[in-house]
Amino acid sequence: MPKRQQVGKSGVTPCKHYLLDKILGSEFGVTSRPQFDNLSAYIVIDLTAGDGVPVTRDGELIPVFNEGCSPGICLKHLDHRAKRHPDKPAVWIAIEKQPETFQQLWKNVSSHLEQLGGWHGTDQRIYEAPVPEWNSQKEGCKLILLNMNSHEFLLHKPLTQLNLDSECAVFLYNDPNHIEDWCLSEQLVRSLPRLTTSLSTLGCNVGGMKRLEIGKRRQWFDRVDMIAGTLQEWHDACLFSIGGPDQWAYLITAPTKWRGRISESCRKAAKQVVGRKADASITWLKENQGDFKDHQRKLFLTKQELASNDY
């Protein structure tokens, strides 16, 4: 069975989607305020877009596109921006590397655009062939679907082609199935503008991660530490986990002054988990580095390794 189906059936997916929805809602709202009029655009980059097939939430007869998948959630906020703040440019870039999955993504997104109305396809390309690409526009908002490997993505290309300067704000969504799918390279992170925030999935024990040898699991430490080491001085990193045997966890980077807001969203997100009671564990790096490191160790190490104090 594909891993994405396992994840969806675990009941954790609604938690992830709730958190993404709340963070995007806040960021689209904040970047539409007058103090951000100098931004060339607010850019949302989904590095692991998938097929755009929504997951059915508990109690629903049919899945809801704008709540049940990351492309639907991103597009919901982008369309709202186009309607409410057409003078505030925004861009959504969705990247999917598998050709068949990309075709399904394109079909699902284009079908929903027809329902929303007002979106028009454009001929403006970011990449030259052979990279498959599909673009659409509504007022000052654009969406770009790219069939490529996110490991090869850098922001300067879209900025150049869209005539945007580097004075923009960026949100990154990174939802890997396993460590090899992690898309936030240090090269990408260091190339991003100073107003960049992110939400990443940390698979932790899904599929028996703690049965992997320690060298493999150390890569999760390396990924989190790399993100923590590139934080702006006014930003912080949050580890949010929801307990249980699968130990799903998320890494969030955001302005320090948003700690309270994001922590509350995390607690509410944990309540969205289906099939079990989920207890939210939340630690902020700059608030308490010791607790943050302990949180990492509990997520990535076995009980025996924790007891040995060798790691």
Language-model segments: residues:
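Flexible, glycine- and charge-enriched loops at secondary-structure boundaries
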Residues: 13, 64-67, 217
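SAM cofactor-binding core of SAM-dependent methyltransferases
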Residues: 18-154
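Short catalytic/ligand-binding loop motif for oxyanion handling, primarily in non-cytosolic enzymes
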Residues: 53-56, 101-104, 154, 180-182, ...
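Acidic, divalent-metal-binding catalytic cores of TOPRIM
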Residues: 133, 137-138, 152-163, 224-227, ...
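Rossmann-like AdoMet/SAM-dependent catalytic core
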Residues: 219-311
